[in-house]
A protein has these predicted regions:
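Short, charged, amphipathic alpha-helical segments
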Residues: 30-44, 62-67
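Residue-level signal for well-ordered alpha-helical segments
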Residues: 19, 23-26, 30, 56, ...
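Amphipathic alpha-helical interaction segments
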Residues: 15, 34, 40-41, 81, ...
Length: 101
C-alpha cells in the first residue's frame, strides 16, 4: 500500500475514534479526553489533513521542517495518559507516518 493510501486510511480511523470518544463523553462515560480537545484540536486538524490527502496532497501546515502535529503535541504535553488510549495510539502512529512523507 502506498504511503498516501496509508495516510488516508489512518486519518479515517482517527476520525472514527474521535467520533467514538465523543459519543462516550456525551453518554456520560469516563474518558481521558476532553470534548474541547476532540472538537477544538484533533478533529479539525485531522479533517484538514484528510481534505488535502483526498486530493492527493500532503499538507504541511507549518512547513516541511516542522512536522509535529498539534494533536501529537497535545498528547505528549498532557498530564493524562492520552497516548495509552486507542485514539492516542492512532495519532502517534499518524505522526510517525507523517514524519516519513
Amino acid at each position: 500500500m502506498r504511503k498516501l493510501e496509508q495516510f488516508i486510511n489512518l486519518l479515517s480511523e482517527i476520525i472514527e475514534c474521535t467520533e467514538a470518544e465523543s459519543a462516550r463523553i456525551y453518554s456520560g462515560h469516563p474518558s481521558q479526553w476532553e470534548i474541547n480537545q476532540l472538537d477544538g484540536i484533533v478533529r479539525p486538524e485531522v479533517n484538514e489533513l484528510l481534505s488535502f490527502a483526498l486530493k492527493g496532497k500532503v499538507f504541511f501546515k507549518y512547513g516541511k521542517r516542522q512536522r509535529m502535529l498539534e494533536s501529537t503535541y497535545l498528547i505528549t504535553d498532557s498530564f493524562s495518559a492520552l497516548d495509552k488510549t486507542p485514539l492516542g495510539r492512532k495519532v502517534l502512529d499518524l505522526q510517525k507516518l507523517y514524519n516519513s512523507l
